Structure formats: structure tokens, C-alpha cells
């Protein structure tokens, strides 16, 4: 290729001030819409990431059956306790980001009858001779995971009846056979060498994991009140969930915004009629970011 010499040319750009201004109008609504869409996408990503971490954690338990089948099996109390305990530990770590260990002194009771359950509270906590006791309402969890609507449970919103039922439920659950958390913890052999390159899961199965995680998160909020504010405040929170916003706020060591329940905000129209003595109006109990 033949080279051609060219004379060097110097260009000069002059900036001259002018009294004339360029007029440009912006549609703020468009920017607001884009900003909102970006925030929603980011929140959705965080929810998917949290659910993926939860499912990956449960895969280390070497479960012998799918999640729904484990809770359908009445005799498989060991795996039921393992799933619930591991889920509580997972939530505890997200609620306390700097804490890596959860309590290992916990006994589990898997209940089957209505007299040992409270509607809307499939997981309850109490103490039995100084040992923390976790009561798991297996039939209720099965209905939640299989998306069955319970139309037979009797729900009475009178405070006196609620308190009596709570007392009877705790009394009945203490008489059941218990499973200690260390019974399965010592035998658990996490498998971290799984090849997940071809791993796939259906939307129905993912919904079951999400439902269980939200259910146990709800129970963990009660557990936090039980451990930090005592039995009286815990029993009170079972009938008045407005205590969540009063006692569960983010601090230097706790992050309620890490819980999936903090991503939801909803109202129930007839809530004021049901509980006129509530501190808050509406049912915005899961909005921790006030």
C-alpha cells in the first residue's frame, strides 16, 4: 500500500456566550414511570434471589420426597421438623445478617387435630420445662401448600374466646410426642456437589416453596416477640398483628427489610369492624419501611 503525505490541518473550536437559551421540555411523568419500573424490577429480582437461596438451602437436607409429600406423610415427623427448623434458621440469618447460628435447643410437636391448632397460625411456640417447643400444624400446612381453601375452621374474633383457645392449644400441644432438633441435625449430611446445570422446577413447585417460606416468616415474627418480649406479648400478637409494626422495626442488628413479608402491603376492608381496638387502621402490618 502506498503512503501519501498530507499537510497537517489544525481545527479550532470557539465557544461563544450567547443570550439565547435552548428550550427543552421534559415529561416528568415519563421519568417517574421509568423510575418506578426500575424499582419494581429490582425488588422482583431480590425476591427471586431470596427464594433461590432458600430452595438451595433445603436441597442440602437430602430430602427423600418432594416438599408437599413430606408434609402429607403423617409418620415423617423427622423430615417435617428438619424442614421447619432449617427454614427458621434461614430466616433468622436473613433477619440477623451478622448472626450465623440458630438455637439448637428446640423440640418439635407435629399436631393433627383442631384442638391443637389456631386458625391462621400453623406454627406456634411455647416453653416446656425450660425447653423451647415448636408446634407444627401439619394439616394446615398441607392445605396451604396444595392451595386448598379451609372452609371448615371456626373463627371467632372475640378476644375472650381467642385467649381461651390459645391457652387450650398450648396445653394440648405439650402433651404430644416431641422431636428434638439435634435428632436430625447430627445425621444431616449436606450435599454441596450437586450438578445443577440441568436443574429445572415448575411454577407450582416454586409456589409451594414460596408459600412455606412466607408461612414460616410469619411464625418467626411471633417467635421474635416470644423471645424478646415474653409469653404475654406473644399471645397478644396472635390476636393483634399490629404489634408487628410496633415491635419489629429495623435496627443496627436486625433487618426486617430482608424478609419477603416486608415486600407486601395490603388492606382488608372490614378489618376495622373485626378489631375496632387495633392501633392501626387497615391491615398494613407488613409494611416495615415506615
UniProtKB/Swiss-Prot annotation:
Q: How does it assemble?
A: Interacts with host mus209/PCNA, cdc2 and cdk6. Forms a complex with proteins C42 and p78/83.
Q: Which InterPro entries match?
A: Baculo_ODV-E27
UniProt name for this protein: Occlusion-derived virus envelope protein E27
What is the recorded function of this protein according to its Swiss-Prot or TrEMBL entry? Acts as a cyclin-like protein and plays a role in the modulation of host cell cycle. May promote G2/S arrest by interacting with host mus209/PCNA, cdc2 and cdk6. The cell cycle arrest is characterized by an intact nuclear envelope, concomitant with sustained activity of host cdc2. However, viral DNA replication still occurs in the arrested cells.
- The UniProt entry lists the main location of this chain as virion
Family assignment from sequence similarity:
Belongs to the baculoviridae E27 family.
Which stretches are transmembrane? none
Q: Name one GO cellular component term.
A: virion membrane
Q: Which UniProt keywords apply?
A: Host-virus interaction, Membrane, Modulation of host cell cycle by viral cyclin-like protein, Modulation of host cell cycle by virus, Viral envelope protein, Virion
GO-annotated biological processes? symbiont-mediated perturbation of host cell cycle progression
Q: What is the lineage of its organism?
A: Viruses, Viruses incertae sedis, Naldaviricetes, Lefavirales, Baculoviridae
**Originating species:** Autographa californica nuclear polyhedrosis virus (AcMNPV)
Q: Where in the cell is it found?
A: Virion membrane
